[in-house]
């Protein structure tokens, strides 16, 4: 084992000098010997003269020059397999739930090659979520990549929690949750909610359905930069066993942000809006590994924070290129009190194709979008001249569009504690039946209030009787 000495410390970036003949490779993990807690450095660059520049996987507080560092000769490796289920781990795969060591028989390096083209699967199957607006307008594919786009406070995490609740329980597959740079409180709430739902079994962790990897907001950038890869590595192991895995990443923007934080310290010139010049490559390395093979599938749902609600920002724009479906959350819809605040006009999916979902579903979804788009165009006229100036046909469009807007809302299981309304899971055929009826004018006589926060169309009819 080669040993070196720390020669420079600048925040999250540390330079280590090794003998010329024993310089570590890029991505090698180095252990700091003097640290009270386990402290790992990951080599990023070889500067010449035996000096390597590293990112600290932890806090560099208290480190000093001259401290000895040992090269492990391999990249960071994390435990994989069933022992990780029901446990909370950090970026290095160490348990942080105070329930003892993970004790896994197998470890994988977090830096792995993406599956080759021959290994990848090309089958298409839909994944029902039970959320009306998603199943109708932007259906998910099994083994696809889904992005939840939204600014601060419009409901990305709540939507993700509901998807975990609906898909993990209905689909009964295994899930890996990677909390990348998000709030510690949300991670804590998630853990206890999963216990209540029976997804995490504290008494017998290996019967759990989810493994959790956290690198929260208060962690140094090295942890936030690599924690997504740690979660993905665990998901890949389950996939290679022939399982269908769900990978939830909250939030992929913080992964980019951590890269931005260390990029300048590594001596790279910033590019547009101050992002790292390697933004597209870093995103590609992560996203290309999230794929389905002939053995099993990884379906990933990623929350994407949109800075200042600007979808053209380089970070969300780079993420867009990799996704099969995009769920866009709109602040204006949230301001109207319509939740989930998913924009049916901005949200897209490659699966919304007559050859995949069928002609009936496709026509219904496009009919809903057409009605809502026409209403959007008429809003200016209504604001200036009022409803009376519209033709009878346009008045009917407005009436139906307002009902559709309200019928797209739905009570969530994970929001029951706030709203007091029990959550509902709406099967796809019920969703289609309701919207087909609305477009055909079958429910023109029902007041629009009846459609607020109901499940199926039958619930709306019941609500109308109470009004």
UniProtKB/Swiss-Prot annotation:
Gene3D superfamilies: 2.40.10.170, Bovine Mitochondrial F1-atpase, Atp Synthase Beta Chain, Chain D, domain 3 (1.10.1140.10), P-loop containing nucleotide triphosphate hydrolases (3.40.50.300). It is found in: Cell inner membrane. GO terms for molecular function: ATP binding; ATP hydrolysis activity; proton-transporting ATP synthase activity, rotational mechanism. One of its GO terms (cellular component) is proton-transporting ATP synthase complex. Its EC number is 7.1.2.2. The keyword Cell inner membrane applies. InterPro entries: AAA+_ATPase, ATP-synt_VA_C, ATP_synth_F1_bsu, ATPase_a/bsu_AS, ATPase_alpha/beta_chains, ATPase_F1/V1/A1_a/bsu_N, ATPase_F1/V1/A1_a/bsu_N_sf, ATPase_F1/V1/A1_a/bsu_nucl-bd. Belongs to the ATPase alpha/beta chains family. F-type ATPases have 2 components, CF(1) - the catalytic core - and CF(0) - the membrane proton channel. CF(1) has five subunits: alpha(3), beta(3), gamma(1), delta(1), epsilon(1). CF(0) has three main subunits: a(1), b(2) and c(9-12). The alpha and beta chains form an alternating ring which encloses part of the gamma chain. CF(1) is attached to CF(0) by a central stalk formed by the gamma and epsilon chains, while a peripheral stalk is formed by the delta and b chains. Produces ATP from ADP in the presence of a proton gradient across the membrane. The catalytic sites are hosted primarily by the beta subunits. This is ATP synthase subunit beta 1.
């Amino acid at each position: 084992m080669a040993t070196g000495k720390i020669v420079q410390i600048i925040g999250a970036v540390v330079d280590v000098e090794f003998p010329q003949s024993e310089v570590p490779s890029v991505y090698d993990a180095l252990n700091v010997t003097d640290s009270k807690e386990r402290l790992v450095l990951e080599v990023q660059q070889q500067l010449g003269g035996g000096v390597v520049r590293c990112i600290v996987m932890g806090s560099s507080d208290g480190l000093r020059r001259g401290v000895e560092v040992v090269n492990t000769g391999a990249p960071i490796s994390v435990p994989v397999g069933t022992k990780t289920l029901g446990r909370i781990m950090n970026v290095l795969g160490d348990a942080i739930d105070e329930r003892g060591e993970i004790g896994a028989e197998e470890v994988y390096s977090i830096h792995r090659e993406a599956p080759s083209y021959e290994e990848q699967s090309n089958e298409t199957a839909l994944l029902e979520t039970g959320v009306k607006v998603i199943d109708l307008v932007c259906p998910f594919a099994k083994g696809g990549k889904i992005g939840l786009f939204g600014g601060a406070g419009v409901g990305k995490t709540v939507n993700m929690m509901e998807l975990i609740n609906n898909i993990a329980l209905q689909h009964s597959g295994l899930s890996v949750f990677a909390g990348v740079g998000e709030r510690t409180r949300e991670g804590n709430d998630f853990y206890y909610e999963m216990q209540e739902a029976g997804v995490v079994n504290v008494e017998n962790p290996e019967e759990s359905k989810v493994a959790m990897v956290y690198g929260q907001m208060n962690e140094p950038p090295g942890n936030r930069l690599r924690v997504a890869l740690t979660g993905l590595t665990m998901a890949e192991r389950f996939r290679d066993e022939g399982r269908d895995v769900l990978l939830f990443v909250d939030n992929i923007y913080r992964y980019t942000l951590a890269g931005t934080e260390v990029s300048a310290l590594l001596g790279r010139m910033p590019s547009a809006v101050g992002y790292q010049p390697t933004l597209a490559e870093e995103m590609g390395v992560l996203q290309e590994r999230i794929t389905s093979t002939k053995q099993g599938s990884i379906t990933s749902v990623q929350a994407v924070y949109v800075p200042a609600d600007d979808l053209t920002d380089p970070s969300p724009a780079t993420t867009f290129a990799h996704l099969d479906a995009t769920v866009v959350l709109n602040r204006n819809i949230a301001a109207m009190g319509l939740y989930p605040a998913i924009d049916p006009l901005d949200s897209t999916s490659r699966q919304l194709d007559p050859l995949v979902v069928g002609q009936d579903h496709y026509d219904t979804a496009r009919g809903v979008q057409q009605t809502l788009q026409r209403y959007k165009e008429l809003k200016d006229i209504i604001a200036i001249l009022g409803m009376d100036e519209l033709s009878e046909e346009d008045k009917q469009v407005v009436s139906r569009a307002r009902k559709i807007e309200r019928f797209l809302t739905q009570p969530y299981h994970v929001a029951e504690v706030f709203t007091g309304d029990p959550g509902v899971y709406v099967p796809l055929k019920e969703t289609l039946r309701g919207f087909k009826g609305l477009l055909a004018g079958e429910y023109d006589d029902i007041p629009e209030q009846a459609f607020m926060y109901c499940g199926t169309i039958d619930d709306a009819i019941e609500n109308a009787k109470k009004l």
